[in-house]
Amino acid sequence: MRTLPADLTHYKTTPEFTQESVPRGLLRNHTTAAGVWGRIVVREGSLRYVIEGPEPETHLLVPGTPGIVVPEEPHHVALEGPVRFCVEFHR
């Protein structure tokens, strides 16, 4: 699994989302802005992280296994059941 580059600075964290409160936009393909990295942090349950592209990747995120979002890379999440998670942003 990917890791964040060491020279990034955390600047924002979303509120905690659940399977009931996750914004619909996160369930559809979207990207971060140029230079913005994301770190999907699952606090409870599990979440499927799908990276789109010529060779799509799918990862099951659980507590202790974050998903790293590369700038401008199309991706989305899919619900697997009960979950609590947030997204940290770095640049």
Describe every region a protein language model picked out.
Residues 26-34, 50-51, 58-60, 77-79:
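Short histidine-centered beta-strand/loop micro-motifs
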Residues 1-32:
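A short, N-terminal "cap"/entry segment at the start of jelly-roll beta-barrel domains
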Residues 71-91:
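Ligand-binding loop in jelly-roll beta-barrel domains
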Residues 51-53, 91:
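Short acidic, glycine-rich loop/turn motifs
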Residues 41, 50, 68, 86:
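Short, conserved beta-strand segments within well-ordered enzyme catalytic domains
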Residues 34-49:
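Short, conserved beta-strand element in jelly-roll/cupin
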Residues 54-72:
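Short acidic-glycine-tyrosine-enriched beta hairpin
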